[in-house]
Regions:
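Bacterial Sec signal peptide processing site at the extreme N-terminus
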Residues: 15-37, 46
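Flexible helix-coil transition and linker loops at the boundaries of alpha-helical arrays
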Residues: 44-51, 84-109, 145-154, 191-194
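Short loop/turn and low-complexity linker motifs enriched in small/turn-promoting residues
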Residues: 178, 186, 198-380
């Protein structure tokens, strides 16, 4: 009977879970229109959790990009990129993830997050006028959307192709520009921005809405699922000097789609091995403790030790999936290309619903030769 009581006493330990750092509070503050609060949270996380540094730098990079601090955004995205592309070894920092919580390791992101890091590096460098680095960033976005841990897929993130081609055109590489534009057009044939006849000296990049939320499901939280936030404006107008120039277009930049597919095929990631062991060890440990009364002498002691060992191992082998994710990503990347006469123009980004983060209107100077890139973020 005493052994049965002991079995019941250790049951609460099975439910014990180690807390992990994440950026949930950052995302909530950001989408409520409180970027200063989001920035404060990120400062605290950067101080407290070195293992999540790449995640926090990416989140902060988005805030800096929207605030027009392109140099700061560049530094954050570059450092995050260096961490995310590093190959994990069996160091003491990584071994904890084998027997501990899945989130207790260095955050390097899912393939779609690595791809979006490359996308943002490209956007920032376009805005800074560093076109070779911009092209490299978009090339990275294409690469990480098409490969993962040795597996090869076909990149289907059309904006990355268009923007790599655009940066290549700025560098005088017409061959890459034509090839990338053709690939983007093949992916989204209905998007006017990808048609060869669409030309212009103004390119507008608009990140729209809220990106996917990563959650854990399953008996032990071992399954990863992504929750979509589909709310977005029905229309986003580009207005120049008080006159509508055109509408920003859906251009195959669905981030939820990128998160949940590989080469267009839906996938689910499950940490099955840990989950199976955890369930089996819990059941075997509790059963052994309950049956310990049936043994005598040394057998009874051995049964107790074995039962406790199994239960403790089930506690420390954590099956929970890592749900840390980049909360400030958009749900969609939209694009526009049009033509303005050389000189100064006031440009407004006007969504049918929602709001433009930080700045909805800005004055630009269109050169006699060359083009201008504008970036905006629209939130609901």
């Amino acid at each position: 009977m005493a052994r049965r009581k002991l079995a019941l006493a250790v049951l609460p330990l099975v439910a014990f879970a180690c807390s992990a750092y994440d950026t949930h509070a950052v995302g909530e503050a950001y989408y409520r229109g409180r970027p200063e609060e989001a920035s404060r949270h990120l400062g605290e996380l950067l101080e407290a959790d070195p293992e999540g540094r790449a995640l926090y730098l990416n989140e902060r990079g988005v805030l800096e990009l929207e605030a027009g601090n392109y140099d700061g955004a560049y530094r954050d995205f570059v450092e995050a990129n260096q961490i995310m592309e590093a190959l994990g070894g069996s160091t003491s920092d990584e071994v904890g993830a084998i027997v501990g919580q899945e989130a207790s390791k260095i955050w390097r992101g899912e393939p779609y997050e690595k791809s979006m890091n490359g996308y943002y590096l490209g956007v920032v460098e376009l805005l800074r006028g560093v076109d070779d680095n911009a092209r490299a960033g978009f090339k990275n976005a294409i690469f990480f959307d098409s490969s993962n841990q040795g597996e090869q897929y076909q990149c289907d993130f059309a904006p990355a192709y268009f923007l790599e081609g655009f940066a290549s055109g700025r560098l005088g590489d017409a061959t890459t520009f034509d090839a990338d534009l053709q690939r983007a057009h093949e992916l989204v044939p209905d998007a006017p921005v990808f048609k060869p006849e669409t030309k212009g000296n103004l390119v507008v990049i608009v990140d729209v809405g809220r990106g996917p939320t990563k959650i854990a499901t399953g008996a032990h939280g071992e399954e990863i699922r992504f929750v979509e936030h589909p709310e977005r404006p029905a229309r986003i107008d580009v207005v120049a000097d008080g006159t509508k120039l055109g509408e920003v277009e859906h251009a195959g930049g669905d981030v939820y789609y990128q998160a949940t597919t590989r080469g267009g095929r839906v996938f689910d990631r499950i940490l099955k091995g840990k989950a199976i062991y955890k369930s089996a060890a819990q059941a075997a440990g509790i059963t052994t403790l309950v049956m310990a009364d049936e043994f005598k002498g040394r057998g009874e002691t051995a049964a107790v030790i074995t039962g406790l060992a199994l239960i403790l191992s089930s506690i420390f082998v954590r099956a929970e999936a890592d749900t840390r994710h980049w909360t400030t990503l958009p749900c969609e990347v939209q694009l526009f290309r049009g033509t303005l006469s050389p000189g100064a123009h006031e440009i407004q980004i006007v969504p049918s619903t929602g709001r433009v983060a930080i700045q909805s209107a800005r004055t630009i100077e269109v050169p006699a030769h060359g083009d201008v890139v504008i970036y905006a973020r629209v939130l609901n």
